[in-house]
């Protein structure tokens, strides 16, 4: 049975924040705090998206009225999964239990 690297994206809402850098730091910190006891082997990074006009990479964060929406990328190695779908189910289960009400979407699955 092969191993897989599953990449999920999540959306975090941060209130009472002034700058985008603060929002990103708080979102990564909150995600790490929730994941640490149960799934400390999950890598957390700021989500990136490509500008449709200039094709440059941009942070997935927006601050409006002291409220931020931050996109995070969560990567997890899943060992000995039966298939890609099985690896996704395992990753969503482990990360979803730790993060509870945070929406998760599959971004990428790679066989290792």
From Swiss-Prot:
Pfam families: DUF555. HAMAP family: UPF0212. Belongs to the UPF0212 family. NCBIfam families: PRK03922.1. This is UPF0212 protein Mpal_1084.
């Amino acid at each position: 049975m092969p191993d897989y690297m599953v990449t999920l994206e999540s959306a975090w809402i941060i209130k009472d924040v002034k700058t985008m850098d603060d929002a990103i730091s708080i979102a990564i910190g909150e995600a790490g705090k929730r994941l640490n006891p149960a799934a400390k082997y999950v890598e957390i990074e700021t989500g990136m998206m490509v500008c449709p006009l200039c094709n440059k990479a941009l942070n997935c964060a927006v601050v409006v009225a002291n409220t931020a929406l931050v996109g995070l990328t969560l990567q997890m190695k899943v060992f000995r999964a039966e298939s890609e779908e099985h690896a996704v189910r395992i990753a969503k289960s482990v990360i979803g239990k730790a993060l509870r009400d945070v929406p998760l979407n599959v971004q990428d699955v790679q066989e290792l």
